[in-house]
Amino acid sequence: SSADGKYTYQTFMDATDLEAATKIYAMGWERCAMVGGKPSGWESRFTNAQYFYNAITSGTLGGSGQGLAGATGSQLAVVNACKSTPSPGQNWCAAWVTNVFKAAGVGTFGGNACDMVKAWCHSNNPADLKVGMIVGDASHPGTGSPGLLYGHVGIYVGDGKVMSNEGAITTKSLDEFIAFYGKGSGVYWGWIGGVELK
């Protein structure tokens, strides 16, 4: 508790690293229960703290990532394929991503959303986000069992927007996408297959 002096305003202000500051905030203000030596919901809390810290310090909070005007070659081919590739159906977000990259001539990359995210998405720093990167989570509670088991994946199309298959093909702001899908394992991005688009 804050009474023992560990989780006070002053200890928060004196914190020199993000992990300590996040823990102090969770324990001192949100009054979270401790689970395994960390505040409850730690993975989601710390992932979101990293996202906002990176966004604030890089000056890209709100409408983050590379703009579409800066995209070239295969990046634009992926954006065009996003706009023309139909939905394979509800709960088939990763299949849509696979179909988009195949249609764009980049390659064929299979797996569930959680597989793609775990293999290729390792950043949540908005400064790293480029047009054509996949964006997703390995697990989230918002869509019930499918989301918890398989996560969700979409494609960053520039200007702070992510397209994905949610039954219909949707376009959301990165902030909206993170607000919904970031409540579990957190949202990360990277190049599918490790193939940097140029």
Model-derived regions, located:
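A generic structural signal for well-ordered alpha-helical surface patches
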Residues: K23-M27, T47-Q50, A95, M133, ...
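Non-catalytic cell-wall polysaccharide-engagement segments
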Residues: S2-G73, K183-K198
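Sec/Tat-exported extracytoplasmic proteins
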Residues: S1-D4, W29-A33, Y53-T60, C82-P86, ...
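...with weaker cross-activation on analogous glycine-rich loops/strands in unrelated enzymes
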Residues: M13, G107-F177, G184-G186
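Acidic, low-complexity intrinsically disordered regions
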Residues: Y25, P88, W92, M116, ...
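N-terminal capping segments
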Residues: T57-G111, K118-A119, K130, S145-H152
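Aromatic- and glycine-rich peptidoglycan recognition patches
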Residues: V35, N54, G62-G73, V79, ...
